[in-house]
Amino acid sequence: MDIKNMIINNPLIKNMIDKKEVGWTNPKEMNYTEYEKKLPLKDQELKEAEERLKRFAPFIKKVFPETEETYGIIESPLEEIFNMQKELEKKYHTEILGKLYLKMDSHLPVAGSIKARGGVYEVLKHAEELAMEAGLLKLEDDYSILADKKFKDFFSKYKIQVGSTGNLGLSIGITSAALGFQVIVHMSADAKKWKKDMLRSKGVQVIEYESDYGKAVEEGRKNSDADPMSYFVDDEKSMNLFLGYTVAASRIKKQFDKKGIVINKEHPLIVYIPCGVGGAPGGVAYGLKRIFKENVYIFFVEPVLAPCMLLGMQTGLHEKISVYDVGIHGITHADGLAVARPSGLVGRLMEPILSGIFTVDDYKLYDYLRILNETENKRIEPSSCAAFEGVVSLLKYEDSKKYIENRIGKNINNVYHVCWATGGKMVPQEDMEIFLNTYLK
């Protein structure tokens, strides 16, 4: 790989190496009508994922009492954040046309992060397959029986493993332990202590690594492959995780319907999602595109210090390039996004549908968190706050400004902006106070 040459001919990568914030629009994005003719996933697969989660709802309701109100459906609020919108406009000298909403996956039941979607789904699917193969479960059963001792005894013979910077580990660990599986979570150096402590309190074995996320995943995969009773949840390559995330789209559609909001050409939707390895934002993006088609525009946001998806997509090298290859160290306060190498599976699935990617300086994550807390009395993880950079920077860069003018034009006044908060509910109070009092600039 001729990195030197690539940098000389690529001003965007040069800016990334210089740790400057950048905005990029995706030149490979396809016209939706053309894209629809060759969908990589069958709609039936998305529907099956939704149906499976419905089957498991009685079990979820039984073992996670916080889901009682929603009858075992794991979902988060969608709320307008008008005061935040006004404060962002004032502080960053910008105009946010349309209305700003927060999708609060930060407050999802069970695991308190977006990973409660894909992570929970993949564990449930694996459990269903094992129980059905053993003749213990039938499709027409009331799945609350999975909480019975005979199932726990059955699952206790099996192991589930995952590599994580934190939130996926929590999601897999909590769900697997509730079913009775033995669980091993391989955690990178970036993982927060409280996340490791919480997992251990639920009987999960946590293996810590001095190195980064990629190493934790690699070791976890190797460890699991050597054990015939072990199943590995692969954040870099898992289609089951991806499918679990897609279900978010049909859920947010129902939330819009309830609010009397119709997404169409005149009232488009722009969604900003923090991105690490890519699985969660990729799955959500794919689902949104299938439902809102050409009327939704999706931007990922990554830390300036770990912009792996941007590097992979912009060069077209995907998982074959790491931020280390261009001299970026990958160490960031956005611990949930501290990933050096992107998922190739997701990068390729995003090529025809993603609008673009922004990067954000670490210091702003804490600034955004304080503004959200002061204006809306809501608290989320610093990693989640990356989403706000998207809405603030949309018209800041020439590229994204032109993109919006060409695609949306005067309808920008009617846009529904959704910042996707990816985690935060489970952060201990004392850690949150530290976040709120962290100033990097």
From Swiss-Prot:
Its cofactor is pyridoxal 5'-phosphate. It catalyses: D-serine = pyruvate + NH4(+). The keyword Mitochondrion does not apply. Its EC number is 4.3.1.18. It comes from the Bacteria. GO terms for biological process: D-serine catabolic process. Keywords: Lyase, Pyridoxal phosphate. CDD domains: D-Ser-dehyd (cd06447). The modification N6-(pyridoxal phosphate)lysine is found at residue 115. One of its GO terms (molecular function) is D-serine ammonia-lyase activity. InterPro entries: D_Ser_am_lyase (IPR011780), Ser/Thr_Dehydratase (IPR050147), TrpB-like_PALP (IPR001926), TrpB-like_PALP_sf (IPR036052). Belongs to the serine/threonine dehydratase family. DsdA subfamily. This is Probable D-serine dehydratase. It comes from Fusobacterium nucleatum subsp. nucleatum (strain ATCC 25586 / DSM 15643 / BCRC 10681 / CIP 101130 / JCM 8532 / KCTC 2640 / LMG 13131 / VPI 4355). The lineage of its organism: Bacteria, Fusobacteriati, Fusobacteriota, Fusobacteriia, Fusobacteriales.
